[in-house]
Amino acid sequence: MSQSHFFAHLSRLKLINRWPLMRNVRTENVSEHSLQVAMVAHALAAIKNRKFNGNVNAERIALLAMYHDASEVLTGDLPTPVKYFNSQIAQEYKAIEKIAQQKLVDMVPEELRDIFAALIDEHQCSEEERLLVKQADALCAYLKCLEELSAGNNEFLLAKSRLEKTLESRRSEEMDYFMQVFVPSFQLSLDEISQDSPL
């Protein structure tokens, strides 16, 4: 039985900081971001199913979200202004991501490869699944902006404005629900969110 470096690589996602060109009150790494995106994507899928007659596999959505940035362990987290500087750079970076995704999949033992390929290779998910993960990814970036702004860091003002436009372009009923029900709390203090739930 041969050894695989797959999970040793994924473990290093915690060493890759997001928002590298911006001053952060608290740094965020790709590993913790992936967990938050998985939780939010799962919630969006559950909301879609329960409230808006959707029929998506919420658990699969959570897993897709958990692995959505896995290739960054090989590529690093390219800052958004660089990644989308022009269409040629965006296209080339997509090609690099695809190569990195395949390299990760190839690290998995052959008898398990199809399971992980279905989670890491973004071309193996449906458009509906992809959109839910993209919504969750943008929502989590937006929540990071709210947290930084609430801590007095105006460095995130323009990012918040840009992400509001992104969220508007990806708008859905489940996202509207999430924004109305869950997002306002991110601008409150610990005391404020704990008032109604004493231990």
Curated annotation (Swiss-Prot):
Species this protein is from: Enterobacter sp. (strain 638)
Gene Ontology molecular-function annotations: 5'-deoxynucleotidase activity; metal ion binding; nucleotide binding
GO cellular component, one term: cytoplasm
Chief place of localization: cytoplasm
Family of this protein: Belongs to the 5DNU family.
Residues engaged in binding a divalent metal cation: H33, H68, D69, D137
Residues annotated as domain HD: 30-142
Protein name as catalogued: 5'-deoxynucleotidase Ent638_2835
InterPro entries (alphabetical): HD/PDEase_dom, HD_domain, YfbR, YfbR/HDDC2
Leading EC class: hydrolase
Pfam families noted in UniProt: YfbR-like
Compartments in which it is found: Cytoplasm
Catalytic reactions of this protein: a 2'-deoxyribonucleoside 5'-phosphate + H2O = a 2'-deoxyribonucleoside + phosphate
Protein function: Catalyzes the strictly specific dephosphorylation of 2'-deoxyribonucleoside 5'-monophosphates.
Binding site for substrate: R18, W19, H33, D69, D77, L78, P79, T80, D137
